[in-house]
Amino acid sequence: MVLTQHRVPDRPGDPDQDPGRGRRLGIDVGSVRIGVACSDPDAVLATPVETVRRDRSGKHLRRLAALVTELGAVEVVVGLPRTLADRTGTSALDAIDLADQLARRIAPTPVRLADERLTTVAAQRSLRAAGVRAKEQRAVIDQAAAVAILQSWLDQRRAATREAGDG
C-alpha cells in the first residue's frame, strides 16, 4: 500500500506512453457510482456514456472492461481526486485501487491517472447553470464529472503533442 500512496497523476501526451489516435475512456470513481465518458476517435471531444453502479461482486469492473472493448478504447483515464493540499486521501486510494484492478482486466490497454481536483464541483455548477435541478443532477453528475476529467486530459494531450511536434 505504500507505493499506492505515492502515485501521482500521469502526464497527458507523454511521447513514450501515448497510444496515438483512438478513443479514450474517462472514469470518475465514486463510492456508489462510476461516471463514464468517451472521446471521439481523434481524441478531441469527450461525451457522456453511462453511470455504472458499484458492486461488491466486481460487476462494475466487468462492465467497465466491456465498455473498453465495445467502444474500442486505446486508453483509459481515471480521475485521481488529490486533496487541495496535493495529498492522497481515501478517495484517491479508492480510485487508484479501481484503476489497478481495471488495468489487470484490460491489459495491454493502458490505464492512466489524471488530476481531477474539483471536477465534480465544476460539473455541478455547469449542470446548475444549464437549469438542471439538484434532484435530476444525481443521475448525470458522475457522467458530467467523467466528461470534465476526460476533456481536460484531451486538451492537455493535444497541447503536449503539439509542443512535441514543434520541438
Swiss-Prot record:
It is found in: Cytoplasm. Keywords: Cytoplasm, Hydrolase, Nuclease, Ribosome biogenesis. Its main location: cytoplasm. GO terms for molecular function: nuclease activity. Its EC number is 3.1.-.-. One of its GO terms (biological process) is rRNA 5'-end processing. SUPFAM superfamilies: Ribonuclease H-like (SSF53098). It comes from the Bacteria. Residues 7-21 have a biased composition (Basic and acidic residues). It holds the Pfam family RuvX. Gene3D superfamilies: YqgF/RNase H-like domain. SMART domains: YqgFc (SM00732). GO terms for cellular component: cytosol. InterPro entries: RNaseH-like_sf, YqgF, YqgF/RNaseH-like_dom, YqgF/RNaseH-like_dom_sf. Belongs to the YqgF nuclease family. Could be a nuclease involved in processing of the 5'-end of pre-16S rRNA. This is Putative pre-16S rRNA nuclease. It comes from Mycolicibacterium paratuberculosis (strain ATCC BAA-968 / K-10) (Mycobacterium paratuberculosis).
